[in-house]
């Protein structure tokens, strides 16, 4: 039969070993499933191709999520999404008040900070930093002038809602991935669902376009079930 493709409803990946859900994306754009075949030409003495031997097949599923997806990023870098206390370096641009004091935007770790004077346009007036003292969530700048702007650099303790760490020695997990696709039958526009069932790893070559219209692209390289029937992909279609 022939079908009109309406849209891809979702793509989900689970750990091939323990079945844990690794990512779910339901704002899919630009999906594509491609197959490849490695071949070798058999030639005669005159270099005429007399036969083509097939050595192996491959499959790749690629798509983008319309929004940045932390689960996909974690799967791409071989990490996981965590939460909780963590430390970051904060860069606060503050306007000094009475006594050269200003309130910090986050909870500081320790009492030390580096302060840089800023010009009216927000640029650094000097590369030299002066020391400041942090106490009760405030920075105090010695000889600070009320109304002047400063850049305060300090170590902050924050409670992260989500955190993804990319390590140089991390390995991407083997996963089972299913894409759910909405189809319509051509004659009567009856609904059908296609399930593209795959097994493989997300590519570690990932790019997060940090713009308002930047999509989160990902690519799955499919692997055959080597200890099974060497299957690469199943496409299962059912009536809605």
Positions of the model-derived regions?
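Extracellular Ig-like/FN3 beta-sandwich strand-entry sites
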Residues: 58, 145-149, 174-176
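Beta-strand secondary-structure signal
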Residues: 60-64, 151, 178-180, 217-221
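Small/polar beta-strand repeat architecture
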Residues: 142-162
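Short strand-edge motifs at loop-to-beta-strand transitions and within beta-strands
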Residues: 137-139
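Solvent-exposed edge beta-strands and adjacent loop segments
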Residues: 1-76, 124-131, 193-217
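Mixed-charge, glycine-accented linear interaction segment located at domain edges/termini
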Residues: 141-144, 191-240
């Amino acid at each position: 039969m022939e079908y009109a493709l309406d849209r891809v409803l979702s793509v989900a990946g689970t750990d091939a070993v323990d079945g844990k859900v690794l990512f779910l994306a339901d704002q899919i754009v630009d999906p594509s499933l491609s197959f490849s075949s490695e071949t070798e030409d058999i030639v005669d003495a005159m270099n005429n191709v007399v036969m083509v031997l097939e050595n192996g097949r491959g499959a790749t599923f690629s798509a983008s999520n319309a929004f940045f997806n932390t689960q996909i990023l974690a799967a791409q870098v071989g990490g996981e999404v965590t939460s909780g206390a963590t430390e970051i370096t904060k860069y606060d641009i503050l306007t000094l008040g009475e006594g050269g004091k200003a309130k910090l935007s986050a909870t500081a770790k320790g009492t030390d900070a580096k302060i840089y004077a800023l010009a009216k346009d927000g640029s650094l007036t000097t590369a030299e930093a002066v020391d400041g003292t942090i106490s009760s969530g405030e920075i105090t700048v010695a000889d600070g002038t009320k109304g002047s702007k400063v850049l305060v650099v300090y170590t902050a303790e924050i409670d992260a809602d989500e955190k993804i760490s990319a390590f140089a020695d991390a390995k991407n997990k083997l996963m089972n991935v299913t894409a759910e696709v909405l189809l319509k039958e051509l004659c009567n526009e009856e609904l059908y669902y296609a399930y593209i069932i795959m097994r493989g790893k997300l590519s570690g070559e990932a790019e997060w376009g940090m713009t308002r219209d930047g999509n989160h692209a990902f690519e799955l390289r499919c692997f055959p079930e080597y200890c099974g029937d060497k299957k690469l992909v199943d496409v299962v279609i059912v009536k809605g």
